[in-house]
Amino acid sequence: MKGNLDWQPTLINIEPEFANFVPTFRNGQIVRDLMPDQPAMTLNADFYFPEDRVVVELKCMETDSRDAYPERVARAFAHFGHTGSELMGFLFRGEPMPERVAGRIRQQIANPLRQALRKANRQIAATKHHLNIPDAFGLAVFANDNNFGLTPANALSILGNAALGLSNCHVDGFVYMTPNVYHHTGDDIARSVWVPLYSEGKESLADFVNSFGNAWIDYAEQFGEPYLERWKGDEYDVGLLTGKPIERFSRSRK
Protein backbone atom coordinates (compact mmCIF):
# COMPACT_ATOMS: atom_id res chain seq x y z
CA MET A 1 0.00 0.00 0.00
CA LYS A 2 1.59 3.25 -1.09
CA GLY A 3 1.34 6.97 -1.26
CA ASN A 4 -0.96 9.89 -1.88
CA LEU A 5 -2.02 11.65 -5.06
CA ASP A 6 1.38 13.28 -5.57
CA TRP A 7 3.17 9.94 -5.42
CA GLN A 8 4.31 8.19 -8.59
CA PRO A 9 4.78 4.41 -8.69
CA THR A 10 8.13 2.79 -9.39
CA LEU A 11 7.49 -0.29 -11.50
CA ILE A 12 9.20 -3.55 -10.59
CA ASN A 13 10.67 -5.94 -13.14
CA ILE A 14 8.77 -8.75 -11.49
CA GLU A 15 10.18 -12.00 -12.85
CA PRO A 16 13.91 -11.28 -12.34
CA GLU A 17 13.36 -9.50 -9.03
CA PHE A 18 11.21 -12.31 -7.68
CA ALA A 19 13.96 -14.74 -8.67
CA ASN A 20 16.46 -12.54 -6.82
CA PHE A 21 14.19 -12.41 -3.79
CA VAL A 22 13.44 -16.12 -3.41
CA PRO A 23 16.92 -17.21 -2.18
CA THR A 24 16.70 -14.58 0.58
CA PHE A 25 13.65 -16.26 2.12
CA ARG A 26 14.03 -19.56 3.99
CA ASN A 27 16.70 -20.88 1.65
CA GLY A 28 14.42 -20.78 -1.37
CA GLN A 29 15.86 -22.42 -4.47
CA ILE A 30 15.50 -22.00 -8.23
CA VAL A 31 14.10 -25.27 -9.52
CA ARG A 32 16.20 -25.25 -12.71
CA ASP A 33 19.32 -25.20 -10.53
CA LEU A 34 18.11 -28.43 -8.91
CA MET A 35 17.65 -30.15 -12.28
CA PRO A 36 20.84 -29.34 -14.24
CA ASP A 37 20.67 -32.51 -16.32
CA GLN A 38 17.09 -32.03 -17.48
CA PRO A 39 16.46 -30.74 -21.03
CA ALA A 40 15.85 -27.02 -21.32
CA MET A 41 12.23 -27.56 -22.36
CA THR A 42 11.38 -29.74 -19.37
CA LEU A 43 8.13 -28.66 -17.72
CA ASN A 44 8.81 -27.39 -14.21
CA ALA A 45 7.76 -24.80 -11.65
CA ASP A 46 9.98 -21.87 -10.72
CA PHE A 47 10.94 -22.25 -7.06
CA TYR A 48 11.21 -24.72 -4.21
CA PHE A 49 11.43 -24.10 -0.47
CA PRO A 50 12.82 -27.33 1.02
CA GLU A 51 12.44 -26.27 4.66
CA ASP A 52 8.70 -25.85 4.14
CA ARG A 53 8.30 -28.34 1.28
CA VAL A 54 6.53 -25.81 -0.93
CA VAL A 55 6.78 -25.67 -4.73
CA VAL A 56 5.99 -22.22 -6.16
CA GLU A 57 5.11 -21.20 -9.70
CA LEU A 58 5.04 -17.50 -10.61
CA LYS A 59 2.73 -16.25 -13.36
CA CYS A 60 2.89 -12.63 -14.54
CA MET A 61 -0.26 -11.07 -15.99
CA GLU A 62 1.18 -8.78 -18.65
CA THR A 63 -1.79 -8.47 -21.04
CA ASP A 64 -4.53 -5.96 -20.28
CA SER A 65 -7.93 -7.68 -20.47
CA ARG A 66 -9.37 -4.47 -21.95
CA ASP A 67 -7.22 -4.77 -25.08
CA ALA A 68 -9.35 -4.90 -28.24
CA TYR A 69 -12.49 -4.62 -26.11
CA PRO A 70 -14.66 -2.89 -28.77
CA GLU A 71 -13.75 -5.55 -31.33
CA ARG A 72 -14.47 -8.28 -28.79
CA VAL A 73 -17.89 -6.79 -28.08
CA ALA A 74 -18.71 -6.49 -31.79
CA ARG A 75 -17.73 -10.11 -32.43
CA ALA A 76 -19.80 -11.32 -29.48
CA PHE A 77 -22.88 -9.44 -30.71
CA ALA A 78 -22.41 -10.93 -34.19
CA HIS A 79 -21.80 -14.42 -32.77
CA PHE A 80 -25.30 -14.45 -31.28
CA GLY A 81 -26.94 -12.93 -34.35
CA HIS A 82 -27.55 -9.44 -33.01
CA THR A 83 -27.90 -6.65 -35.54
CA GLY A 84 -25.63 -3.69 -36.03
CA SER A 85 -28.41 -1.49 -34.70
CA GLU A 86 -28.47 -3.50 -31.46
CA LEU A 87 -24.71 -3.12 -31.16
CA MET A 88 -25.01 0.64 -31.69
CA GLY A 89 -27.76 0.72 -29.08
CA PHE A 90 -25.39 -0.72 -26.50
CA LEU A 91 -22.43 1.42 -27.50
CA PHE A 92 -24.15 4.77 -27.95
CA ARG A 93 -27.72 4.72 -26.62
CA GLY A 94 -27.21 3.18 -23.19
CA GLU A 95 -29.10 -0.02 -23.97
CA PRO A 96 -28.12 -3.04 -21.84
CA MET A 97 -25.73 -5.65 -23.16
CA PRO A 98 -27.56 -8.94 -23.83
CA GLU A 99 -26.74 -11.49 -21.14
CA ARG A 100 -25.42 -14.07 -23.62
CA VAL A 101 -23.04 -11.48 -25.02
CA ALA A 102 -21.91 -10.42 -21.54
CA GLY A 103 -21.35 -14.06 -20.56
CA ARG A 104 -19.21 -14.70 -23.63
CA ILE A 105 -17.06 -11.64 -22.93
CA ARG A 106 -16.64 -12.63 -19.28
CA GLN A 107 -15.49 -16.05 -20.43
CA GLN A 108 -12.98 -14.56 -22.85
CA ILE A 109 -11.57 -12.29 -20.13
CA ALA A 110 -11.30 -15.25 -17.74
CA ASN A 111 -9.68 -17.69 -20.17
CA PRO A 112 -6.05 -16.45 -19.88
CA LEU A 113 -6.14 -16.78 -16.08
CA ARG A 114 -7.76 -20.20 -16.27
CA GLN A 115 -5.15 -21.39 -18.76
CA ALA A 116 -2.33 -20.01 -16.62
CA LEU A 117 -3.64 -21.84 -13.56
CA ARG A 118 -3.95 -25.11 -15.47
CA LYS A 119 -0.37 -24.76 -16.71
CA ALA A 120 0.85 -23.93 -13.20
CA ASN A 121 -0.82 -27.10 -11.96
CA ARG A 122 1.04 -29.17 -14.56
CA GLN A 123 4.34 -27.44 -13.76
CA ILE A 124 3.97 -28.03 -10.03
CA ALA A 125 3.05 -31.67 -10.61
CA ALA A 126 6.07 -32.19 -12.87
CA THR A 127 8.41 -30.58 -10.34
CA LYS A 128 7.12 -32.75 -7.51
CA HIS A 129 7.77 -35.77 -9.73
CA HIS A 130 11.27 -34.68 -10.84
CA LEU A 131 12.38 -33.84 -7.29
CA ASN A 132 10.63 -36.85 -5.74
CA ILE A 133 8.61 -34.74 -3.30
CA PRO A 134 5.06 -36.09 -3.80
CA ASP A 135 3.76 -34.66 -0.53
CA ALA A 136 5.04 -31.10 -1.09
CA PHE A 137 2.60 -28.20 -1.17
CA GLY A 138 1.94 -26.43 -4.46
CA LEU A 139 1.50 -22.64 -4.55
CA ALA A 140 0.70 -20.57 -7.66
CA VAL A 141 1.50 -16.84 -7.45
CA PHE A 142 -0.25 -14.55 -9.94
CA ALA A 143 1.40 -11.15 -10.28
CA ASN A 144 -0.63 -8.47 -12.03
CA ASP A 145 1.93 -6.58 -14.07
CA ASN A 146 -0.22 -4.69 -16.57
CA ASN A 147 -3.86 -5.80 -16.43
CA PHE A 148 -5.98 -2.78 -15.52
CA GLY A 149 -9.25 -4.47 -16.46
CA LEU A 150 -9.60 -6.63 -13.34
CA THR A 151 -10.37 -5.77 -9.74
CA PRO A 152 -8.87 -8.13 -7.14
CA ALA A 153 -12.36 -9.57 -6.62
CA ASN A 154 -12.65 -10.33 -10.36
CA ALA A 155 -9.30 -12.11 -10.42
CA LEU A 156 -9.95 -14.09 -7.24
CA SER A 157 -13.34 -15.21 -8.51
CA ILE A 158 -11.89 -16.41 -11.81
CA LEU A 159 -8.99 -18.22 -10.14
CA GLY A 160 -11.15 -19.74 -7.42
CA ASN A 161 -13.62 -21.17 -9.91
CA ALA A 162 -10.80 -22.40 -12.13
CA ALA A 163 -9.11 -24.14 -9.18
CA LEU A 164 -12.33 -26.01 -8.41
CA GLY A 165 -12.28 -27.37 -11.94
CA LEU A 166 -8.73 -28.73 -11.86
CA SER A 167 -8.41 -32.47 -12.26
CA ASN A 168 -5.57 -34.13 -10.34
CA CYS A 169 -5.02 -30.85 -8.53
CA HIS A 170 -1.52 -30.02 -7.25
CA VAL A 171 -2.28 -26.35 -6.47
CA ASP A 172 -2.97 -26.22 -2.74
CA GLY A 173 -3.26 -22.45 -2.73
CA PHE A 174 -2.72 -19.40 -4.84
CA VAL A 175 -1.82 -15.76 -4.30
CA TYR A 176 -3.04 -12.78 -6.29
CA MET A 177 -0.63 -9.86 -5.95
CA THR A 178 -0.42 -6.51 -7.71
CA PRO A 179 3.12 -5.11 -7.36
CA ASN A 180 2.74 -2.91 -10.46
CA VAL A 181 -1.01 -2.21 -10.39
CA TYR A 182 -2.44 -0.01 -7.65
CA HIS A 183 -6.07 0.43 -6.66
CA HIS A 184 -8.30 3.33 -5.67
CA THR A 185 -10.56 2.61 -2.70
CA GLY A 186 -12.07 6.04 -2.08
CA ASP A 187 -9.24 7.73 -0.18
CA ASP A 188 -5.98 9.30 -1.32
CA ILE A 189 -3.88 6.16 -0.90
CA ALA A 190 -2.91 3.95 -3.84
CA ARG A 191 -3.05 0.36 -2.67
CA SER A 192 -1.52 -2.88 -3.89
CA VAL A 193 -2.59 -6.31 -2.68
CA TRP A 194 -1.25 -9.72 -1.69
CA VAL A 195 -4.30 -11.95 -1.29
CA PRO A 196 -4.09 -15.73 -0.75
CA LEU A 197 -6.73 -18.44 -1.12
CA TYR A 198 -6.32 -22.09 -0.12
CA SER A 199 -7.82 -25.40 -1.11
CA GLU A 200 -10.03 -27.00 1.50
CA GLY A 201 -7.89 -28.78 4.07
CA LYS A 202 -4.70 -26.98 3.00
CA GLU A 203 -5.01 -24.00 5.35
CA SER A 204 -1.77 -25.03 7.09
CA LEU A 205 -0.01 -23.48 4.09
CA ALA A 206 -1.08 -20.07 5.40
CA ASP A 207 1.83 -19.63 7.83
CA PHE A 208 4.31 -20.00 4.99
CA VAL A 209 2.34 -17.79 2.60
CA ASN A 210 1.88 -14.98 5.12
CA SER A 211 5.59 -14.93 5.96
CA PHE A 212 6.42 -15.19 2.25
CA GLY A 213 4.21 -12.19 1.50
CA ASN A 214 5.65 -10.07 4.30
CA ALA A 215 9.18 -10.85 3.14
CA TRP A 216 8.36 -10.00 -0.49
CA ILE A 217 6.80 -6.68 0.53
CA ASP A 218 9.92 -5.87 2.58
CA TYR A 219 12.05 -6.71 -0.46
CA ALA A 220 9.90 -4.76 -2.93
CA GLU A 221 9.95 -1.65 -0.75
CA GLN A 222 13.53 -0.96 -1.85
CA PHE A 223 12.32 -0.01 -5.34
CA GLY A 224 10.40 3.07 -4.25
CA GLU A 225 9.39 5.15 -1.28
CA PRO A 226 8.48 3.42 2.01
CA TYR A 227 4.93 2.17 2.30
CA LEU A 228 2.62 4.50 4.21
CA GLU A 229 0.79 1.63 5.87
CA ARG A 230 0.23 -2.10 5.75
CA TRP A 231 -2.99 -3.88 6.52
CA LYS A 232 -3.30 -7.59 7.14
CA GLY A 233 -5.94 -9.82 8.62
CA ASP A 234 -7.97 -12.98 8.28
CA GLU A 235 -10.93 -11.15 6.71
CA TYR A 236 -10.77 -9.57 3.28
CA ASP A 237 -11.48 -5.85 2.98
CA VAL A 238 -14.38 -5.49 0.54
CA GLY A 239 -13.37 -1.98 -0.46
CA LEU A 240 -9.90 -3.13 -1.40
CA LEU A 241 -11.09 -6.21 -3.28
CA THR A 242 -13.43 -4.09 -5.39
CA GLY A 243 -11.03 -1.17 -5.79
CA LYS A 244 -10.55 -0.03 -9.36
CA PRO A 245 -7.03 -0.20 -10.82
CA ILE A 246 -5.38 3.20 -11.25
CA GLU A 247 -4.08 3.45 -14.79
CA ARG A 248 -2.69 6.98 -14.59
CA PHE A 249 -1.40 8.94 -11.62
CA SER A 250 -1.76 12.70 -11.72
CA ARG A 251 1.15 14.97 -10.91
CA SER A 252 0.55 18.01 -8.74
CA ARG A 253 1.30 21.42 -10.22
CA LYS A 254 3.91 23.42 -8.35
List PLM regions with ranges.
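Active-site beta-strand-loop-beta-strand hairpin of nuclease catalytic cores
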Residues: 48-56
